[in-house]
Amino acid sequence: MPTYNQLVRFGRKSKTRKTKSPALESNPFKSGVCLVVKTVTPKKPNSALRKIATVRLSNKRTVNAYIPGEKHSVKEHDRVLVRGGQVPDLPGVKYHIVLGAYDIAGVKGRKQGRSRYGAHRKQVAATKK
């Protein structure tokens, strides 16, 4: 417990919080160029081939970003938009690629949760009366 005089001299130091996505530098999104597209296996007890891409961001940092959804159109040298968000069973993957932005198409045929996967609403034919 500090004395009153110590508080007058030094004050209280507030704790600094460590960010979970440092490469974004406090921005909600960063654009980048895709360098490599690959598949990785998750931690135990899960089993799959998760799609990730190595992306060089506009601030010259290189990060691994997860490609969400079924099927994707991400290729090498594509321009992508990256947001924060960890993948729980992939160590070292702290970012997500935003589908439907820049060179990346949204997931086709998606009916629920469309905004997360860059899918457009299916057009219903207008009926005449």
UniProtKB/Swiss-Prot annotation:
Q: Which UniProt keywords apply?
A: Ribonucleoprotein, Ribosomal protein, RNA-binding, rRNA-binding, tRNA-binding
- Which intervals of the chain are annotated as region Disordered? 110-129
Annotated SUPFAM superfamilies:
Nucleic acid-binding proteins (SSF50249)
The answer to whether UniProt assigns keyword RNA-binding to this entry is yes
What does the UniProt function comment say about this protein?
A: With S4 and S5 plays an important role in translational accuracy.
Q: Which HAMAP family match?
A: Ribosomal_uS12_B
Task: Supply the name of the protein.
Answer: Small ribosomal subunit protein uS12
Which species is listed as the source?
Rickettsia prowazekii (strain Madrid E)
